[in-house]
Design a protein with these regions (language model features):
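Catalytic cores of carbohydrate-active enzymes
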Residues: 21, 28-32, 36, 42-46, ...
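Acidic/polar, glycine-enriched structural segments that form the non-catalytic walls/loops
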Residues: 16-88, 150, 161-164, 226-228, ...
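Extended glycan-interaction surfaces of carbohydrate-active proteins
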Residues: 53-91, 106-123, 170-207, 251-349, ...
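Disordered, acidic Ser/Thr/Pro-rich linker "stalks" and the adjacent N-terminal cap
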Residues: 514-600, 609-620, 648, 680-682
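Non-catalytic carbohydrate-binding regions of carbohydrate-active enzymes
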Residues: 230-268, 303-471, 528
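Aromatic-rich carbohydrate-recognition surfaces in CAZymes
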Residues: 30, 90-196, 208-216, 279, ...
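Fungal secretory targeting signals
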Residues: 1-18
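Trp- and acidic/polar-enriched beta-sheet ligand-binding modules for extracellular glycan
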Residues: 359, 616-684
């Protein structure tokens, strides 16, 4: 992983147009793991090194959080490793699913978003754990790839999830309410004040702009998908009516003209707070209605954006505050894990809401003409906010790109900083680059709309290419002077056989674009080796050394990443090897890792991931081979083996003649004086 230093990306000139050198770029950012990204991600570069570095780092986060569940396919996780409140044994959480799907819609391998959506709408997922915008995100995926069957097949499940929220709907107010903790935002004004300022982790139920915006967006998505499927006029009418009713109630009841902001009203009624009263301050959550295009385009509502820019209100030196300094309990720390501060939303910067605000701002700048004409906020502000968000990804103490849970708004330093916090996938970024800064605005119609949102005095050039859209491959380029790419202005390329569209200004352009069929997902083998958690009896791992379930589980849990920090360690670790020949002690010249499937299975190939880090003392083995347990109970090398050379911090491929066995073993020779970390031994 090569993400600690800004890199000068290389371009070549081809027929007058700049083409990014994918091999060089991916090698620089991902090292030996570059093949995973090669045919999957759009390429991007810009004159701002932080934006470029963060873009590729965010794809490494995406890659790290694709957990293989075996027959269930892939899901996106929120934390790198297991946490107690995840849905077991899968390790799923639904609060950030919307972000995960929006990032995944730009991945050329559609399997990740499709497997994930299938799982999240299944009965094995905890679909009600947190408030969510899953249906809306699935629809937004359709706007990119145009695959009708991918969205219509989930229509029934979407309605089941939507209707389940009736228990949180107040018919007298026409609004949904939620406990802030279930809104994934503990310690808000409503929960702290409901406790009398004593706590705020639980309680504080409120009618919030967040959940009502999510339900508005989900209702619109269900109506759109039903219309797409056809023959469901009643469903279309029902959900459009629900969306419209929510829209009006949010605007009528949650807009506070004094604060010029959408804010909570209390659902809870106790000695500290009163039912239906407004909370006593602005929160960043009040900008979420624009994330989902809920507000009407009125000058009155547009004034809310002024508070996002005000340094004494929601704009902190290092990022957007979740609450304002004027609040009595702003940044008061209530909750700890030992001596470490825990998660709170009473002022800290959260990438979660940063993403929502920037998504909403892109919507506002793109199609709210009355609001934008006020000049209350501009593309220059979008650029500044996006750049500040990008900088948040790099820890100022270590200089390493490592996104964590929340940050101090004055310093940009992580607040929580627990082991679970590193490389946290609880937000989006690359969707903001592609649909915001670069400006590809996905549509259900057969058009390509490009409306870049950036400050030309700050961003002098950028290029994004290999972007999937409606079955086409799109490239979008800006060069203020023409000195970087050899072509001045905005350039749009569609596939390889279409003329280039160009214009001198970075302004909105709409191009008719008949859609092609969406590409099929990559054909992916089903892994048979995945142990979903340590309590699942089979498959299970054993090893010649460090042989405990807690150790071996990490090498067969379906997770692959190569972050070079000890806090992000992943896999089974063997101690330092010496030159003796014993195979059952710490001094093994040859070591092994075994998988017991619990029954006879057919195995014929493997993907093997070894970690290497000079600073941590890990090296990939010098050689390896695969063995299976024969019917007589003895181990033997597989027949017809084709072993690729060992790849450190990447995937080593192995194939052999398919064979039935209950157990398979990876035997390897470590480097003398070095430790070995087996990140994953995935068997097919």
């Amino acid at each position: 992983m090569k993400l600690a230093t800004s890199l000068a990306l290389s371009s070549v000139i081809h027929q007058g147009l700049a083409i990014l050198d994918s091999k060089a770029i991916l090698s620089k950012y991902f090292g030996n793991d570059a093949p995973w990204y090669q045919d999957r991600i759009p390429l991007f570069e810009s004159s701002d090194a932080d934006l470029t570095d963060t873009y590729y780092y965010r794809w490494s986060i995406f890659r790290a959080h694709q957990r293989d569940l075996g027959a269930y396919g892939f899901i996106s996780t929120e934390f790198l490793n297991d946490v107690s409140w995840q849905t077991k044994p899968w390790a799923s959480l639904n609060d950030a699913t919307g972000f995960h799907l929006l990032e995944a819609r730009w991945c050329r391998d559609r399997r990740f978003k499709e497997d994930y959506a299938n799982f999240m709408y299944s009965k094995d997922s905890n679909r009600r754990q947190f408030s969510e915008s899953m249906a809306s995100a699935v629809w937004d995926g359709y706007l990119v790839d145009g695959s009708v069957s991918d969205v219509t097949k989930r229509l029934d499940a979407m309605q089941v999830v939507y209707e389940a929220w009736k228990d949180s709907y107040d018919t007298s107010k026409g609004l949904y309410w939620v406990e802030p903790l279930r809104d994934a935002t503990e310690y808000t004004i409503s929960s702290i004040d409901a406790s009398g300022g004593l706590d705020g982790f639980t309680g504080g139920e409120a009618f919030r702009p967040t959940i009502n915006s999510y339900q508005y967006a989900n209702a619109r998505a269900i109506a759109n998908i039903a219309a797409l499927k056809g023959g469901l006029d009643s469903t279309v009418s029902t959900y459009n009516s629900r969306a419209e009713a929510l829209k009006q109630r949010v605007q009528d009841a949650l807009w506070n003209s004094t604060f010029e902001h959408f804010i909570d009203r209390f659902k809870v009624n106790n000695q500290n707070v009163t039912y239906w009263n407004f909370i006593r301050g602005r929160e960043l959550a009040g900008m979420v209605p624009w994330t989902h295009d809920l507000p009407d385009d009125k000058v009155e509502y547009a004034q809310a954006w002024s508070h996002v820019l005000n340094s004494s209100q929601l704009s902190g030196p290092a990022g957007l505050r979740t609450g304002e300094p004027s609040y009595q309990y702003y940044m008061r720390q209530y909750r700890y894990e030992g001596k470490n501060p825990e998660c709170q939303w009473n002022g800290p910067v959260w990438p979660f809401q940063y993403t929502q605000v920037l998504s909403g701002l892109a919507n506002f700048l793109d199609h709210y003409p009355n609001g934008t004409q006020t000049g209350v906020i501009t593309p220059k502000d979008y650029t500044a906010m996006l750049r500040k968000y990008a900088k948040l990804h790099r820890n100022p103490s270590t200089g390493i790109l490592d996104l964590e849970e929340d940050y101090h708004p004055d310093t940009g330093l992580p607040i929580v900083g627990l082991k679970r916090s590193h490389h946290y996938f609880h937000s989006g970024f690359n969707d903001l680059i592609i649909s915001g800064l670069v400006g590809l605005r996905p549509s259900a119609s057969d058009i390509l709309v490009v409306n870049p949102l950036f400050d030309p005095s700050t961003i002098t050039y950028f290029r994004a290419e290999r972007i999937p859209y409606h079955g086409h491959t799109i490239a979008i380029q800006w060069d203020a002077s023409g000195s970087h790419y050899g072509s001045r202005g905005l350039v749009i390329e569609i596939d390889d056989d279409n003329p280039v569209i160009s214009q001198p200004t970075a302004s909105r352009i709409s191009i008719p674009l008949p859609r092609k069929p969406a590409p099929a997902p990559f054909t992916t083998r089903i892994a048979k080796s995945i142990q979903l958690n340590t309590t699942v009896p089979f498959p299970r791992g054993m090893a010649s050394v460090a042989n405990s379930t807690s150790n071996t589980y990490a090498a067969i849990d379906g997770r692959v990443w190569f972050f070079d920090t000890q806090d992000a360690a992943n896999g089974w670790e063997a101690p330092v090897a010496t030159t003796t020949t014993t195979t059952t002690t710490n001094d093994a010249a040859e070591m092994w890792f075994e998988i017991d499937f619990g029954q006879q299975v057919s195995v014929g190939s493997a993907e093997i991931a070894f970690f290497q880090s000079k600073s941590q003392g890990f090296a990939a083995p010098t050689q390896y081979r695969v063995q299976v347990l024969g019917q007589g109970g003895s181990w033997g090398d597989v027949e017809g083996a084709m072993y690729a050379e060992v790849v450190a911090n990447g995937i080593t491929e192995a194939e052999w003649k398919s064979v039935q066995s209950q157990k398979v073993r990876l035997v390897f020779t470590p480097v003398v004086g070095e430790k070995v970390r087996l990140v994953e031994f995935k068997v097919f």
